[in-house]
């Protein structure tokens, strides 16, 4: 009867209480049990108070309770029903794979990096395109402005061409005028001999004159033909005497055009030797004081010779830009 009462009383006690009572009967402290089982004192205390640490797996907790039961001489079979309540088996929480999470974060970071790279690339391409378009537009505007200026200057030159031709004609007339007095003098000298009226016949002049007196009168009378002989024999000035072959200027600038091209040439004194549009298959010969400053709208459409040597314009043709260069006395074109 006492045995059954004791058995019922043991069943009423929890697993932790039975282990604590057994420990106290053996005179062991919690520190001694913890040292023998190689556990923490807090773990032994939690077992006796029927607490299940959240950070401790149920499998380990059941193992600690069994070791504690063997230490205090309690059969494990008597504690099994209480173990199911105190330390039920729980599914272990499997932590997510660290490598997978790291790979996912790395992939996300790589995606952002790739997006940023493409964005920078698009910005660079856009800026390059905008810069090229602005440069091209500026060149076109400059060519248009130069063409307008050349047209205006060409119109001014055409309006001034008539007075220049008149002055040239006047100079030529003045050059030929000195020959007129000579011819007029000769004509006037000869005119009295031809148009002089015949004198009236005087009865006294019909008388016979002695031969000696006739000779004296003949010698004293000047011969009209003798006065005209020097004028007729004198050579008249001709235009061929005034024509001279001009010497070749060592600073001459020769240009041949294979297409329509706008051009402006200025010499060292600042004088514009030419400014305007040249047509295809045209040529231009200019002379002035070196160095020359040239501004060419289409470098590929012109071939330049200076001092008998061709001028290299390949660097302007490759870049398709308006050529600005200076030709000095040593024929070293510089931009």
From Swiss-Prot:
Residues 30-49 bind DNA. PROSITE patterns: HTH_CROC1 (PS50943). It is a single-pass type II membrane protein. Residues 165-205, 217-239 have a biased composition (Low complexity). Keywords: Cell inner membrane, Cell membrane, Cell shape, DNA-binding, Membrane, Signal-anchor, Transmembrane, Transmembrane helix. One of its GO terms (cellular component) is plasma membrane. Residues 148-164 have a biased composition (Polar residues). Residues 1-111 are cytoplasmic. Its main location: membrane. Residues 148-244 are annotated as: Disordered. Pfam families: HTH_25, RodZ_C. GO terms for biological process: regulation of cell shape. Residues 133-335 are periplasmic. It comes from the Bacteria. It is found in: Cell inner membrane. The chain crosses the membrane at residues 112-132. Gene3D superfamilies: lambda repressor-like DNA-binding domains (1.10.260.40). Residues 19-71 form the HTH cro/C1-type domain. The helix-turn-helix (HTH) motif in the cytoplasmic domain of the N-terminus is involved in the formation of spirals to maintain the rigid rod shape. As this protein is anchored in the cytoplasmic membrane, the HTH motif may contribute to protein-protein interactions to form the RodZ helix, which is localized beneath the cytoplasmic membrane. The C-terminal domain may be critical for determination of the rod shape by probably interacting with enzymes required for synthesis of the peptidoglycan layer, including PBPs in the periplasm. Belongs to the RodZ family. Cytoskeletal protein that is involved in cell-shape control through regulation of the length of the long axis. This is Cytoskeleton protein RodZ. It comes from Escherichia coli O81 (strain ED1a). The lineage of its organism: Bacteria, Pseudomonadati, Pseudomonadota, Gammaproteobacteria, Enterobacterales. The gene is rodZ.
């Amino acid at each position: 009867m006492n045995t059954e009462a004791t058995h019922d009383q043991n069943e009423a006690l929890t697993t932790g209480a039975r282990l604590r009572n057994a420990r106290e009967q053996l005179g062991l402290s919690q520190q001694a049990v913890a040292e023998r089982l190689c556990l923490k004192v807090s773990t032994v205390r939690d077992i006796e108070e029927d607490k299940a640490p959240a950070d401790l797996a149920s499998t380990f907790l059941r193992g600690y309770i069994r070791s504690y039961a063997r230490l205090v001489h309690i059969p494990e079979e008597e504690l099994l029903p209480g173990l199911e309540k105190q330390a039920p088996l729980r599914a272990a929480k499997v932590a997510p794979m660290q490598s997978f999470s790291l790979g996912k974060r790395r992939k996300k970071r790589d995606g952002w990096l790739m997006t940023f790279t493409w964005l920078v690339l698009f910005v660079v391409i856009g800026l390059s395109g905008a810069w090229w378009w602005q440069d091209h537009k500026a060149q076109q505007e400059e060519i248009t402005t130069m063409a307008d200026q050349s047209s205006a200057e060409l119109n001014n030159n055409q309006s001034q061409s008539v007075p220049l031709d008149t002055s040239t004609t006047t100079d030529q007339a003045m050059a030929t005028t000195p020959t007129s007095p000579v011819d007029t003098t000769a004509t006037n000298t000869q005119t009295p001999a031809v148009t002089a009226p015949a004198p009236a016949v005087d009865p006294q002049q019909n008388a016979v004159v002695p031969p000696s007196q006739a000779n004296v009168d003949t010698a004293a009378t000047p011969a009209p033909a003798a006065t005209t002989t020097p004028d007729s024999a004198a050579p008249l000035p001709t235009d061929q005497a005034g024509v001279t072959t001009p010497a070749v200027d060592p600073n001459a600038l020769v240009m041949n055009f294979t297409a329509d091209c706008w051009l402006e040439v200025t010499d060292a004194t600042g004088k514009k030797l030419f400014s305007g549009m040249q047509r295809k298959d045209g040529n231009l010969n200019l002379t002035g004081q070196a160095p020359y400053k040239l501004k060419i709208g289409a470098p590929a459409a012109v071939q330049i010779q200076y001092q008998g040597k061709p001028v290299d314009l390949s660097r302007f043709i490759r870049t398709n830009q308006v050529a600005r260069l200076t030709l000095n006395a040593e024929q070293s074109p510089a931009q």
